[in-house]
């Protein structure tokens, strides 16, 4: 019973940690990703006309539509250079207050193509040695002119160049902070050379809107030439990987639980040998082989299920304590969270209980049949 309880407790804790990590990732995505994202079904760029945009805005639940133009480019400043990911946005991005809470220094504005300012990830800001006090020498941004590259070799005529000053520093998460520069949309169009084209249209919903319902309405409006993704679908591979890892952990722990159930197997086997005389007395009293078999199977289930209940109770208490007090630290400097995240799901307890019942039932079959054979001398 003790071994089963320990395995069940460990399984509940591990599954709760995976749930917590998934919940944390989703919360992190909510910080910088839109509720819905409109992409072209087969092209790198997408463009919606004024009629389409007006029709989308009329859908209940849609608060903002943010056109964005994204691509990688090179920035240079003070003999330093870095490949970053530019994200061009218009005034609707600022109107939606996106990433405003993540500003740790500076002012939340972008300017325009004539005098461009940018919201810069803190990693980019520090690695490039940027400063708000510098108002003379802007940061240079370079991007290859693909049309010229097809006809000429790489030289200064095949590179587009723009300049900007930092207006604010953003701190979101490491990968975002180390590569993101948010710039005015018109500035980004000039750098990339694709006026009117967008990487995506990002939709922010009102608080009471259902993302799946709005998604279906947008898809119905735009047709098959466009793809509409929810926030989870934008990170489908990562979330799927977490679920697969959780499944494999469950299977591995179930296998370990199966090994631990050998203690139940031997305990019941010894009980059969020890109670041989008592079993024959039961036979003399008229017990049938089927009744005896059920008795030992039921005994095995009681022992294992008692251990499972104790294990689930201990797992619940320890998970609750970690959730409330952060007992086990994450151990990563400058992490967004200090302790391992925990999120308990009722289905984890249910499937753990099912796994315990199935495994222990199988482990009880041989001792139960052995008891019947020894008592009734069945070969």
Q: Residues of each region from the PLM?
A:
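Peri-transmembrane interface segments
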Residues: 1-2, 207-262, 271-273, 282, ...
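Short acidic/glycine-enriched loop/turn elements at secondary-structure junctions
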Residues: 63, 72-165, 190-192
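Transmembrane alpha-helical interface segments in multi-pass membrane proteins
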Residues: 269, 278-322
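Hydrophobic, regular-secondary-structure patches
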Residues: 11, 15-85, 91-114, 220
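Hydrophobic alpha-helical transmembrane segments of multi-pass inner-membrane transport and secretion
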Residues: 1-19, 243-278, 301-310, 358-362
